[in-house]
Amino acid sequence: VKILSVSDKVIPFLYSPEILEKIHDVDLVIACGDLPYYYQEYIIKKLRVPLFFVRGNHDPVVEYDANGERKAPRGGKDLHRRVVYQDELILAGVEGCNRYNRQGNFQYTTAEMWMNVFRLVPELLINRLLYGRALDIFVTHAAPLGIHDKPDWTHRGIKAFNWLIRVFKPKYHFHGHNHVYKLDTITETQVGETLVINTYGYKVKDLEL
């Protein structure tokens, strides 16, 4: 399965006809938040593949343009607190990050983040019984605690995500939120059976499932 994952930064060539020259044969797109909805719509319109997304803390509740208002990328599938099936893949997600101000969108307290994760648990347990595995791809905006995160509260990782990774062992965990400015920054870390990937900007990955 070949995946284009995006987050946090608009990449000029992905928002131009050049996308068709540089991105080939992807099966789906994963968006990890803090991206304009129109940008995500453009990508799936050009590539003609499904897009699965979560929102980030800088995403608007409503986005406006000449075509009216949108509350999500049209044609995309929201993964927040949901388990979704695409062909033989099992995906689930959690949006947002740690709450750092009262008025911010898509921010959660520690307790709320645990509840977001626990909302996924019943169906993941059923999947384990039915399919022998609970989850293939976990999609979030924030990182797990201590993995690709930063010391400030806004960018600190989410402990509930570490628990989900340990208990349900998805093959991959895609996240964004933490910007990457240095070439030597670690963006992929194996945690038990899960490869955690910071997809800041974009990545194209051939997944082994």
Specify the residue positions occupied by each region the protein language model found:
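Active-site environment of divalent metal-dependent phosphoester hydrolases
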Residues: 10-14, 35-41, 57-64, 98-104, ...
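Binuclear metal-dependent phosphoesterase catalytic core
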Residues: 83-87, 162-168, 180-209
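Short, conserved loop/helix-junction motifs that constitute active-site signature segments
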Residues: 23-24, 44-48, 71-73, 131, ...
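Conserved catalytic scaffold of divalent metal-dependent phosphoesterases
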Residues: 5-13, 55, 59-61, 66-156
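Active-site neighborhood of phospho(di)ester-bond hydrolases with catalytic His/Asp-centered motifs
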Residues: 5-7, 28-34, 51-57, 79, ...
